[in-house]
Amino acid sequence: MSDINAARLPSFFFPVPCISDDIEMVLTRGESLC
């Protein structure tokens, strides 16, 4: 999951894949997966 989001937004969600992944999931799909 983290790799998918990292591939989408490497500029913003790369330094913190876990936390950013969680936020990205919540904002985009509405589900937090860390």
From Swiss-Prot:
There is a cross-link at S11-P17 (Cyclopeptide (Ser-Pro)). The keyword Heme does not apply. InterPro entries: Amanitin/phalloidin. The keyword Transmembrane does not apply. GO terms for molecular function: toxin activity. Keywords: Toxin. Processed by the macrocyclase-peptidase enzyme POPB to yield a cyclic decapeptide. POPB first removes 10 residues from the N-terminus. Conformational trapping of the remaining peptide forces the enzyme to release this intermediate rather than proceed to macrocyclization. The enzyme rebinds the remaining peptide in a different conformation and catalyzes macrocyclization of the N-terminal 7 residues. It comes from the Eukaryota. Residues 1-10, 18-34 form a propeptide. Belongs to the MSDIN fungal toxin family. Cyclic heptapeptide that belongs to the MSDIN-like toxin family responsible for a large number of food poisoning cases and deaths. Cycloaminide E is structurally related to other cycloamanides that are non-toxic to mammals but show immunosuppressive activity. This is Cycloamanide E proprotein.
